[in-house]
Amino acid sequence: MQLMTYTLGGKVAKANKREYGTTNVNIDNTSALFNGFDNVNGFLMSHTDYVDVVPDGFKNIGHTSSCPNAAIENTEKNLYCIQFHPEVNNSINGTLVIKNFLFNICKCSGDWIISSFVEDSIKKLKEKIGNKK
């Protein structure tokens, strides 16, 4: 989140106090990223730096009592940033954040399986290599 913000012209600042642990995040559930959410959800936070000023074109879609920009989005460019960790067990509905990102925003199909990846890779390699060793 900080790298994207800095790269796109926003400002990152160091917090007076580190935010660590499961924290209530106030979210904008009209965002595609938070579709199906209540207004307040618990997510694991682990950071010292935070986004102080969002880049042009971004809007705030989540904040905590000590982090003014815990989630931001630029729907025109299809860019989303979150300060928290949806992938860990103590983030309530973290899996839903990931699903919303993959299926609603990125439009992934959800039918990918490792065995088809392996089979497709072997087939492509055989076609490329042919009889060469």
Regions found by a protein language model. Give the residues of each.
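RNA-binding accessory domains that recognize and position tRNA/RNA substrates
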Residues: 6-133
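Local cysteine-cluster metal-coordination motifs and their immediate loop/turn environment
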Residues: 1-4
